[in-house]
Structures are given as C-alpha cells and as structure tokens.
Amino acid sequence: MTPTTNNKRINFASIKNPLFYPDFLEVQLKSFHDFLQLDTPPERRKKEGLYKVFAENFPITDTRNNFVLEFLDYYIDPPKYSIEECLSRGLTYSVPLKAKLKLYCTDPDHEDFATVIQDVFLGPIPYMTSSGTFVINGAERVIVSQLHRSPGVFFGQSLHTNGTKLYSARIIPFKGSWIEFATDINNVMYAYIDRKKKLPVTTLLRAIGFEADKDILDIFNLAEEVKVTKANLKKCIGRKLAARVINTYIDDLSDEDTGEVVSMERITVVVDREVELTEDNIEAILNSNTQTILLHRNDSNTSDYSIIFNTLQKDPCNSEKEALYYVYRQLRNAEPADDASAREVITNLFFSDKRYDLGDVGRYRINKKLNLNIDPDIKVLTNEDIIEIIKYLIELVNSKASVDDIDHLSNRRVRTVGEQLYNQFGIGLARMARTVRDRMNVRDNEVFTPIDLVNAKTISSVVNSFFGTNALSQFMDQTNPLAEITHKRRLSALGPGGLSRERAGFEVRDVHYTHYGRLCPIETPEGPNIGLISSLCVYAKISDLGFITTPYREVKNGKVDFSDNGLKYYTAEEEEEKTVAQGNAPLDENGRFVRERVKARYESDFPLVTPDEVDLMDVSPTQIASIAAALIPFLEHDDANRALMGSNMMRQAVPLLRPESPIVGTGIEGKLVKDSRTQIVAERGGEVVFVDASCIKIRYDRTADEEFVSFDDAIVTYYLPKYRKTNQSTTIDLHPICSKGDRVEAGQILTEGYSTQGGELALGRNVQVAYMPWKGYNYEDAIVLNERMVREDFFTSVHVDEYILEVRETKRGLEELTSDIPNVSEDATRDLDENGIVRIGAHIEPGDILIGKITPKGESDPTPEEKLLRAIFGDKAGDVKDASLKATPSLRGVVIDTKLFSKAAKKKSRTSTKEAVSKLDETYAKRQQQLHERLIDKLTELTKGKTCCGVKDYLNVELIKAGSKFAKKDLEALDFNVIQLSDWTNDAHTNELIKAVAVNYLKHSKEIEAELRRRKLDETIGDELPAGIVQMAKVYIAKKRKIQVGDKMAGRHGNKGIVSKIVRQEDMPFLADGTPVDICLNPLGVPSRMNLGQIFEAVLAWAGRKMNVKFATPIFDGASLNDMNEWTDKAGLPRDGKTYLYDGGTGERFDQPATVGVTYFLKLGHMVDDKMHARSIGPYSLITQQPLGGKAQFGGQRFGEMEVWALEAFGASHILQEILTVKSDDVVGRSKAYEAIVKGDPMPTPGIPESLNVLLHELKGLGLSFSLD
C-alpha cells in the first residue's frame, strides 16, 4: 500500500489566518441546485429557475376559456442508469422530470367533465453530477458561464466624421425589443426601435401619452403659459413661441357611395413654433379658439434644452393619435386598421409583461442609474424611465454627466448554468404550451386528461440540442484535476448573445480595474480568444443578480473589522468610490495600520492614504488571481506573459504514474484536490472497516435518530476507479491512503492518484536542475534530460484509448462479430474470443486485429425472391468480407478492458422472456413489501400512544381522523405518495422523525422501482443502442509512455521546452558530492523572459529537499530573500544557488559556477508519439487525386509552390517531375511505378497529372473547349 506522506508545509505568509477559500465549484453546483430547488418544499419555492418557467407558462387555457390546465408542482424520479453506466454505454445521465398538473372545466354545460390531477412525464433532463459536469452521450461536458452585457440602460458617445460628439442611451432588456435614444449632428434627438426604425423622441413621447407640445415642454419645465387676451399678447410682442398654436375643428364629409355623413377631426396650424409674436400673429391667435399660448422662458436653463425645441421642429405629429399612427407606419410599413391596433403596437413593444421583460437585474440597474424608486416587481418600461433617460441624455449633451464604461464589471453580468437552462426550458415550455392550447381547441366535447394534452418530446428536444450543440456546452478538459476545475470556473464572453472573436476589439479584452479579485488578469488563452475567456478569482462569488463579487474587510477609523460582520462581498458597483488597502498591509494586534501612510487602491488609481481614509481591506493578497495562477510560487517575480503561459500549461500536465507534490507550493494545492471532487472524501466521522485496491468501506457514526429514520446500512462502500479513461485519454487511477481500523473525519481525503499525492495536487516531479548549456543541445529552450528520468519512470504516464466497432443491419444481411474471418491466418486471430473481441491482457502491435467483424458482400442488392429463399434455406448471405477493426500504425499497448453491448436477441422465445419478467416482478414486489413493513414498524413505534392531529392527502381528505389513536392497520392502508407529511401529532420532534422516515422510504421505494424498470428493459430490449445498430463492441488499450526525445515539458513559470537529448547518467554534469543533475536548462531562457520565479523556486526547493521539508509561499505574500537565506544557510547551500559543476564526460570542473536547484517540472499533453507520422501508401483526395493531409487522414506532406521553387533553383528536374507526378496525382503512372518497383524494372515515364485534368474541366466549365494533341 502507498505510504501516507506528511505534506505539512512551512508557510511564509504574513497573514496567518486568511479567509477560507469558498467552494471552488460553487459557481456550477449552487446555480444548478437553485435552478431545480429540489430540497425546497413546493410551497416555499422561490420564483426562480424551473419553478419560474412553469409559473410564467401556466395556467394554459383554450381560446374560449372553457378548459384550464394548472401547474401544481414538479419533481424528479431517480435516474435510469448510474453515471458509470452512462459513461461506458454512451448514454446521457438524466432524470425523468414530472409535473403534477390539474385540468378542470369552467363551462357549466360540461357537467360530466371531472377535475383531473395527474402526474405528467415531461421528458428526461440531463442532471448535474456531484462534480459539476453533465454526462451527454457518454462524454462529460461542462456548461461554461457566460459574461454578457447586463440588462439596463447604457449611455455612450461616438464621434461623427465631422468631429461632432454624438451621445446615445440604449435600453437592453432581458427579453424584448431594444430601444435607443441618440442625438445627431443637427442637435436633434431620435429614438431607434430595434436598431432600425427611427422617429423623433417627441413623437414617441406623444405616443405614450404626452399629447400636446405643452405636455412635452412641461416635462422639462421649458415654457411659460400665457392666457390669450389682447392685452397679454401685446406685452409679449417680440418673444418667440415655444409651441405651435393649432386650431382643431370637426369637418363633416359625405361618403360618395352611400351618402352617409362622416365627422372627422381636422387640425390646422395657426402660428408655427419658434415664430416671434407680431401684430399679425396676435390677430390670428385671437381669431382661433386657443385659450393659452406657450412662450419661451427667459432663464438660462432653457438653453440646455435647445435639443427638445430642435426635435419638436422635426416632429411631424401634433397629437397622440397622429403619433401612434406614425409609429405604426414606421414599424409595420402599413396603415393601422384603427386606433386600438395602433396603440397596441407600442404597448406590446415596451409595456406588456408578456413581450417585454427587463428582469430583476434590468430594473435594479435602471433604478440605480437614474435614481428612481420604481417597484422592483415592475419589469416593463414606464413613462418615468423614458423621461429620465431623455433628461440624462440632455445632461450628457451639456457635459453635466458622464458616459458609462462598458467594460466596467457593473455593466457585465454572468449567465450561470441555471440561467442558461432557464432560458432553454422557457423556449421548450412555450412550445409545449402552444401544442397544449391547440389540442384543447380541437377536443371540444370529449373527456380528456392532462397526459393527452402534453407532448414530452418538445422540452427534451430543446434541452438536448442545447447540451449537444450550444457553444457554451463544452467537452470537458479532463487532462488533470486542475484542468477540470478551471474549465468549470471559466467565464466566456463568446457564445449566443455574446461577442464574436472577429468583432471584439482591444478594450473588451483588456484588463480593467474592476477585475481585481473578480476576474483573473493572468489566466486567459493565448491566440484569438485572449481576454474573451477568463477565469474566476479564488475568492470570487456570483451574486443572485449575476454580478461577480469579491470579499473585503470593513475598515472604520483606521481599524480593520476582523469579525464575521466585517466581512462582506462587494460587486464592482458597490466598490466604486471606496479606498481599499492591500491584504498584507502591516497591522498591530488590535487591527490598526502600523504605518502612517497606507498603499491603497481607489478605482483605477493607487494613492498613498492615511489609515482613516481607508474604507476596505483585501482579505488576502491571493485574491487577485485564479486557481491556476495562484498555484505558481513566486508569481510576483514573473513577467505576466510568462505567468499566463505557466498557468495555461499546468492544465496540460498529464497525470504521471508516480506523481509527487511540489516541494515549493503556494498552500492552495490541498483545497483544490478536495473541491475538484476527483478523490474520495469522507462524508463525516467514522471508521474504515475494509480497504483494498478496488474499494474502501467505512462505518459512519450516526445518532440514534439518524439510525432510526434511515433505511440504509451504516457501512458505505466506495469503489475506486482503476485506469478509467478521461476525455483527453489520460487515466484516473486511484489508490487508498487509509488503512483498516483508521478513524476518519469529515472532509478527509482517502485516496490519491490522478495527479494528486498525499491529498495535494501533484502535476509533475521535483527534479535537480542546472542552468547551463550542454553541448548546444539546449539551444532555443530545448531540454537535456538525465536517462535516470526514463529508467526510474519519473515522467512515465499511462494513456488509454477507446476503440469502438458497431454491428449494423445492412441491406445484404446482418453483420457479425466473429473470430472466423476469411483469408486471415490463425496466428492473427489467436487473441480473439468467440465474439471476435481481443482478450484482456493481449499485447497489441500495429496491424493487429482488435475486433473481428464480417460483413455480407454482394455485387448487387438481393431481390425479394432471393431474400425469401435465403430466409427459408438458411443460406448465410453468400460471400462475406473482412470488416475488422485493426490497430493503427502507431498503436502499441495492452488491452485493459473490453465491453460488448447487444440488443435483446431475437432468438429468445417470448415465453422465456415473459417468465423472466414475471420472476423479476415477484422479486422486486417482495423487496417493496419488506421495505413497507420496515416503514410501518418504524411509524408504529413513533406514534405509539400518540393522539392523531389528522392525516390528510393532497386533496385534503382526512384518512386518519383527528383525535383518534394511531393503529397499525390504519398506517398500512396509507398511500405515502399522496399523503401530507406534516403535523401528524402535537409533538414537533415526532413530526420531524415521521417526515424523515416517510421521505427516506419514498426515496428507497422509487430506487427499487427504477431498478426494476432497468432490469425489465435489459430482459426485453437489451442494451440501449442507437437506431440501426445491433451490437457495439468496445476495446480499451492502455499505453505506457516514458518520456522521450520530442516530448514537451514545462515548469510552472512559463518555461517550456522540448526534450532534445536523453543523456546517460554518467555523462550528465554532477555536483561536488557526485550527484548528477536531472535536467540541464539553457540560462538564456531566463533574462529575456523575465520569469525569475523559477530561480527563487529552484533555490528554495533545493534547501527543502536537503532539509526534507515542504514550503508554502502564497503569491504576493511569499518567502522574502531573508526567509530564503535562512533556509539555504540551514541546509548549508549557497544563498544564490550558484555552485561549481563537473563535466560528466571528463570529470573536469567547469570554469564558472552555475545556478543549481530543484524545480518542479511537468510533462505536457503534447507528446511526440501523437504527432510523429510518416505516410507510405494511403488515401487520395477524390477530385484532385492528390494524397490527403494530416495524421488523422494518414496523409502525406504537401510539396507546395515554394518548395517547387527550391527544386527549380537547384535544377533538380527529375526529382521535381517525380514529385509532381508519380508520387502525387498521376493515377496511371503511380500504379505502374509501384509495379516496376515490385518487379525491379526501370521506372516508367510519368504521365499526365490529374490536377491538369481538373484545370481543364474547370476551363470547360467556363465554356472553353480544349484538346491535348
């Protein structure tokens, strides 16, 4: 058994009790948990997630409101297959979703229609595993969270080509039409609906109820109202009109055809706005029926609002009706039928909660931005919103407000798994509601039930396409535990509703000051996705509204509050205008700052402030980075570009056969292993009762109450995965690190393996390294390795490949798995069993048969008569051909597992199947009976002597009367599926126990039912396989890969290289005490890369190895030079790590001392075995007849245009002709050449290459006729 290792580390952190890290997978698990709310009783469920989807789509009624389908509750049943079975059979790990629906009739004519309550199956929904993944079609997938623009209002500015600043305000809803307000170069404000339809803002204001000019001017308090009298008007001569003077009158028109008289309202403009009052105007105004006129105010305030006057001038409408008609015409390009339909369009756009939804976030953001107090439950736009947005925009135009920073994290929020699923279920349920409504309308007088109305496929098809095809549903990166956990904590700005790589500019990708403690500034991919895909910081959490928060301690009057109340999580918006001190700022024992000036952050600035000015303090210096970056020791000494490479490459480290945790770590390694859920962890205190390589059995401690309510055994068995294939073909292979009789505590790690050792992450090995050139072999970052690394399996890893062969039913008959293959020697099939599958333990070489299969072959499809004769006389489908699966050219390994899945054999008689099924029914009925008896015994004991308070079912029918005593026969008669489990007695504790017992009973009963269904399926249908496939065979081959020349290796500081030479141990440079170094690295790789962390690590780890201790040096708060000197002195090593080395070949001392130390090195997943490839004879492209490209296609090397130039320059005409013809696409020539080589004849003359024919055909396609004479 593996000895347990003491991984207690010496920690150099100045903060001795930093905040505990939150659960690293919380972002996935909590979101999914909140989406389903399964642990919450239906009456207490929050209106979010799945419950909200149902609430939004139900009740469903038919068009006449006769029938109503109401939603009562939803629940899930146990999954049909376990996670392991789904992984091996290629199935989706899902649970059946069922809803309790109530159908009743409101029509008094339908007396015969009884109210029906039914449980309706709505389809299977993929269920998250305990480690935050989904198993879809046998592969583990992760739903990546999306970082997108938050709903709300955004103010921006752009520059016109003539230099004018244009301002805009955009309202982004959760669902519904976008509306944008923007100014133009003429200082007029327009509203754009859905980015295309343009109308003056005043037209929109009229359409939403501000009908007259007066109403619009009153909003902004821009006009003075003057009563129309001759005297008043005379006083105002010379002042400008702020609003039109209009005359409204009724015009009677007679219809020419019918002679009917129609009255129409007519409007005429008496005096236009912006006209000065003169004697002539006054006369006209007095003659109109106007009571008051509006004049410009004389105060300075109105000049700010010139944009409103300009817009009014552009406004073609004078009344609400005209405005509504104008909006309708703009949106629909047609005339409205009547006033109601014109009004409906604008209502539906922004004021209808069915079509428009700002969401909780949108309403919160708008209220916050515009200082409004609108009820958070109002999720549609209000007139107040629109007016305040226009006012803010006017302030922007007058430089009295500032535009929003779109990259500020208060303007971006996270869509987690739960929200993405909520959107998908919303689509699915809306579709389902439509079909339900249609079916209700068709069924007029029939009696029908909810099951008849609901089509279960609608929801599952939407959800399945989301998991299968959405850009955010990704094949999990499972190279090692770090890769897994990072993938689950990733945030992507790409995906539906997000940005696209091509359109994303520099600003979006850049690091922003609000990323501090929220998004890691280091970990992001290199390449086109840089900055668009980022990782959550170690302490970051996502708030209920979807904003990223980070914790700070409050500081009051220069004193840090270390109590639980002093620790709060802040969003980027809440952190604005706060001064934040660094996490390692020196404090005295009372929590006061020691220094008079404190280094702090204030928004994007870094001022030195007095302690009294500090508002908050970081909880830890590690807060700024993500998990991968926080794993790099001495990160503070590395250049950010190299740190980025380092954190990305650690995710590519393959799990080694003998991993070792780093001597110099950062203290986060243990937490990562526990939270990754890849190891087996004790659930609570208990004792190990059995251990072997394949399982661990633990008897957990249970209280008397827990013992009583449980139907489980006290001993829990954990099965250890052995060489399980991961998505990236690495292996998960766990070994126990506990012994029989050990006491275990909650959270204790019981196993190691899969890149962990002693409960800590162990991605690589600690190796002795020398920074010195070695005969030029480490030029350009190449790595020289000691042969000991190969011999002692330092960097040996095991990789498992899965090979699948499907047996189908073809037109010419059934394919068959067999070891009896035509024209194949007995020697080639010696390792195959009777099903043609290779035996476990067989050594595989290239070309070996893995799975033998024969397929019927015929020149043409058999006629029906032939088929009939063959069926009668049992003649096997005539000829068969070999369709076996053979090992690829680079495959060498050992078969570690084989599987065969078959649909139920047709040969089995119906009676034998029936017998087997009835036997199963009997067995499981007996198990259910025993379970029920145990339940009744427990309940009888609990209710002994107690008086009943009334036991009711869901329809409130009393089954055991209140005031009576509990009797065993009464309890036996109860159906626990429909019973209300609360308040059976007066004793609260008894009631809790009754509920717990019944819930546990129901859970076990459902599990037994699910198991019975499974067994019946196996008996009747066999294994679940895709349509058209009769059998499926799988072979797993393990390859043991030692490190070799061409493999890629790296340290944790972005120092990567390719192994260029493996040198015998005796030839490697050695230390004064005779120890040969393990690796020689080029010292020139350090200065220009500026990743000095590797030198610090090498020196400290060397001291650690000498003293047999391990260190934790957290980032930005790690070991100082003094700390390192102290340990190197203790170990008797040079402080700078420089020492004289001796040449392994001659034994002479090298002239200059070299830096020597111990560095943690990883072997990355880019191995030469996967890349090296050479083509002999292989496939050709169909049209050009040239060899294909790439290893996967067994392709050749392209001899391109530039390579041709090179041969032309040398005048190598024969080589050139050969390459361009017989070695490539001269079809006749290449077969002749092959023949000539086999027979030993001279090479034939090359013919015409096929590419010339392709060119000729293309020219013929252009209508040009050619002939080659």
Swiss-Prot record:
<comment type="subunit">
    <text>The RNAP catalytic core consists of 2 alpha, 1 beta, 1 beta' and 1 omega subunit. When a sigma factor is associated with the core the holoenzyme is formed, which can initiate transcription.</text>
</comment>
<dbReference type="InterPro" id="IPR015712">
    <property type="entry name" value="DNA-dir_RNA_pol_su2"/>
</dbReference>
<keyword id="KW-0240">DNA-directed RNA polymerase</keyword>
<protein>
    <recommendedName>
        <fullName>DNA-directed RNA polymerase subunit beta</fullName>
        <ecNumber>2.7.7.6</ecNumber>
    </recommendedName>
</protein>
<dbReference type="Pfam" id="PF04563">
    <property type="entry name" value="RNA_pol_Rpb2_1"/>
</dbReference>
<dbReference type="InterPro" id="IPR010243">
    <property type="entry name" value="RNA_pol_bsu_bac"/>
</dbReference>
<dbReference type="Pfam" id="PF04561">
    <property type="entry name" value="RNA_pol_Rpb2_2"/>
</dbReference>
<keyword id="KW-0548">Nucleotidyltransferase</keyword>
<dbReference type="Pfam" id="PF04565">
    <property type="entry name" value="RNA_pol_Rpb2_3"/>
</dbReference>
<dbReference type="InterPro" id="IPR007120">
    <property type="entry name" value="DNA-dir_RNAP_su2_dom"/>
</dbReference>
<dbReference type="GO" id="GO:0006351">
    <property type="term" value="P:DNA-templated transcription"/>
</dbReference>
<dbReference type="InterPro" id="IPR007641">
    <property type="entry name" value="RNA_pol_Rpb2_7"/>
</dbReference>
<keyword id="KW-0808">Transferase</keyword>
<dbReference type="Pfam" id="PF00562">
    <property type="entry name" value="RNA_pol_Rpb2_6"/>
</dbReference>
<comment type="function">
    <text>DNA-dependent RNA polymerase catalyzes the transcription of DNA into RNA using the four ribonucleoside triphosphates as substrates.</text>
</comment>
<dbReference type="InterPro" id="IPR007642">
    <property type="entry name" value="RNA_pol_Rpb2_2"/>
</dbReference>
<dbReference type="InterPro" id="IPR007645">
    <property type="entry name" value="RNA_pol_Rpb2_3"/>
</dbReference>
<dbReference type="InterPro" id="IPR037033">
    <property type="entry name" value="DNA-dir_RNAP_su2_hyb_sf"/>
</dbReference>
<keyword id="KW-0804">Transcription</keyword>
<dbReference type="InterPro" id="IPR014724">
    <property type="entry name" value="RNA_pol_RPB2_OB-fold"/>
</dbReference>
<dbReference type="InterPro" id="IPR019462">
    <property type="entry name" value="DNA-dir_RNA_pol_bsu_external_1"/>
</dbReference>
<dbReference type="GO" id="GO:0032549">
    <property type="term" value="F:ribonucleoside binding"/>
</dbReference>
<dbReference type="InterPro" id="IPR007121">
    <property type="entry name" value="RNA_pol_bsu_CS"/>
</dbReference>
<comment type="similarity">
    <text>Belongs to the RNA polymerase beta chain family.</text>
</comment>
<dbReference type="InterPro" id="IPR042107">
    <property type="entry name" value="DNA-dir_RNA_pol_bsu_ext_1_sf"/>
</dbReference>
<dbReference type="InterPro" id="IPR007644">
    <property type="entry name" value="RNA_pol_bsu_protrusion"/>
</dbReference>
<dbReference type="GO" id="GO:0003899">
    <property type="term" value="F:DNA-directed RNA polymerase activity"/>
</dbReference>
<dbReference type="GO" id="GO:0000428">
    <property type="term" value="C:DNA-directed RNA polymerase complex"/>
</dbReference>
<dbReference type="GO" id="GO:0003677">
    <property type="term" value="F:DNA binding"/>
</dbReference>
<dbReference type="Pfam" id="PF10385">
    <property type="entry name" value="RNA_pol_Rpb2_45"/>
</dbReference>
<dbReference type="Pfam" id="PF04560">
    <property type="entry name" value="RNA_pol_Rpb2_7"/>
</dbReference>
